[in-house]
Amino acid sequence: MLPRGYSKCGPWLCGLLGALSIAGPCVADASAVGSTNVTVADPTVPRPPGTPCVVTLFSGDSFVDFSDHPYSYAPPGGCGTHWAKVVLEADFSVTAGRQFDRTAQLWLGGVNLYYGTTQEPSSTVSPSWHVERDLTDYSALLRQAGTGRAVLGNVVNGTYTGVIHGSARLLFYPASLRAPGALTPDSVLPLGSDAVGNATLLDTSDSPLSKTLTLPTNIDRAYLDVIAQSQSSDEFWYTCVPDSYAAEVQECGGGNFREAEVSIDGQPAGVAPVYPWIYTGGIDPYLWRPTPGVQTLNFMPYRVDLTPFAGLLSDGNPHTVAVNVAGANHYFLASATLLLYQDPHLRRVRGGLLRNTLAGQAPTPTIGDTLATDTDGNVSGAITTRLSRHYVIAGYAITSHGRVDSTVDQTVAFTDTQSFTIDASTYRQVTDQLTSVDGVSRHRIGRHLVAEYHERLRYPLHVDYSFDPTSDGGYVMATQVHQGYTNDIRREFAGRTLYAAHVSNTVDAGDTLDFDGSFNVTGHNGQQNAQSFAFRDSLGGCYRTDVASTDGVVTDEATGVGCPDGQNHVYWFTRPDGSPVSGSALLGW
C-alpha cells in the first residue's frame, strides 16, 4: 500500500510503484541537542534495498598544503554494470585551532563528483561532517577504470594550524526486481581541460570554460551540469555595487549580477543561475557555527537542458560547448559535465535547431538608484539591479521514435536591491536579492505532446549588516542573514502528471561582533542560527528536519514535523536533497 498523502498517478506508474520498496522511515540518529559539532538539516541520499558494493577512493588523507591527492578507480566486482543507484559518501574533519574555510573537490576522469567547502574550526572545536551525492546519472563514467584526485588546498603553519582530514567512497546498489536499474545517460563528458580533473578559473565575463568535442551521432537528449563558485574579489559578489557607486557607498565594485551563460559554437544555448553560497568564514564566522549556510558544505549543480541541440550535436562535426560567468570580476571557479542520452536503435540521428530567442538577448542588467547625499555628507537610498529574460529554444531530431520536436521555454530573472544608511555614527547595508527560474521543457512526436518537465526555482538572499562605533572607542558589527533555496518540479506524460516534488532549504543566522579601537575582535554575542529543510512529493514522500542553535550550541532538533505519523519517509529513487534530474517524462529511474 502506498503511504498516506499519495496523489493520483497513471496506471503504468501505479503498477511500477506497487513492485518497488520504499526507503524506511528516515529517523534521525541520536539527538544533536547540546552538540557544538557541525549539525545540518539536509537529508542524506535515500537508498534502495540490497547490499551495496563499496569502492574506496581515498581514506584518512591529510590536507596540509596544495599538493596533489590522486587516487585510482576501478568499477566494483559482484554488482554488475547496471546499477539501481550510485552514491558518493565523504567524511571530513579539521583539527581545533585556526583555519580558513577551504574549497573541496573530488574528480574522476575530468568529471566533478563533489564540490563544496569546509567548516572552519575554533580553538576548542574540531568539527567533522559528512556529505553525500547521488551519482547515479554518472554511471557511464563509473563503468570504466580511471584516475581521479581530491583537490583541497590548505595552509598549515604557526598561524593557521587546522589540519583537514578526509575519506571518500562510492556505494553501488545492484539492480534487482525491487530496485530496477536506473535509466542513465550513455555518455558523461567533462568540459574541463584537465584529464584527471580540476575547476577552471574564470576571471572575467569573457573567460570561458570550454571544450571542442566530436560527439556520438545518435544523441536524442542532452544536458549540462554546471557549478560556478565565487572566489577572491568575487567571494562577496552579492553585496557589490556597480563601479560608479563603489566609492560613494564604500563597497566593492563590479556589480552584483552573476549568471552562468552556456553556449554551443558561440550561440547562446542556456542559462545556469549562480547560487549565493556563503562560506563558513563569510561575513562573520560565528554565524555558521555549528550550522553552515545553504549548501555550503555540498554544492548542488544546476542542470541545463540542451536537448533542442541534439540533432545539431549528432551531425558528426566538432562542436564547442562553453560556459562563461556574466559579471565575473576576479574570479569564479567553474565545472561543467555534459550528459548525453543516445538512441539505442539508430547509429545516426539527424535534425537541427529551429528557433533560439536567447540569441540576441545579452545578459545586461538595468541599474537604478535612489541615493541621496545631504550637506553633511550623509548617504541614504538604494541601488537596484534588474534583469529578466524570457526565451524559447526549439529543435528537432529524427529518432527511432520518429521526429521528436523539443522546446525549452524559460524565464530567468534577477533582482537585487542594495540599501544604504551611512553617516558619522552608522554604516548599514541591506542586501535583498532574488534569482528565479521558471521553465518548461516539452517534447512532441508529431502532433502529440508526449513529455513535459516543469521547474520553478528560487534563490532568495537577505543580508542586513551594520557597523557602528561604541562609547568606549570600539565598534560593533551586527549581521542578520536569510538564505533560501526552493525548487518545484513536475513531470507530465501525455498531459497527465506523473510526478511532482517540492524542495525547500532555508537558513537564518544572526550575530554581533565586538571590536576594539584597532579593529581587533574582542568577542561576540547574540549568535543564533536555524535551518529548516523540507521535501514533499506526489507519491506521499515527506521529509522535514529543523535544527536551531544559540551561542554555537545546538538547542533544538526536530524531524518529521508535518509528515504522516510524524516520520520522515521517502522513496529510494527520489531526490529529496534537490540534486538535479533529467526532464524525462518517463522518470529517471
Regions from the PLM with identified roles:
Residues S205, P216, G254:
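Short, contiguous, pocket-lining structural segments
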Residues D29-P70, A74-G80, D91-S187, G197, ...:
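Beta-strand-rich ligand-recognition modules
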Residues W12-G24:
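Bacterial N-terminal signal peptides
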Residues D203, S207-L209, S232-C240:
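A short secondary-structure junction signal
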Residues G78-V87, L215-Y223, D234:
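Extended extracellular/luminal ectodomain segments enriched in beta-structured repeat modules
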Residues A182-D206, L213, L346-F414:
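Compositionally biased low-complexity segments at domain edges in trafficked proteins
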Residues L2-C14:
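Bacterial N-terminal signal peptides that target proteins for export
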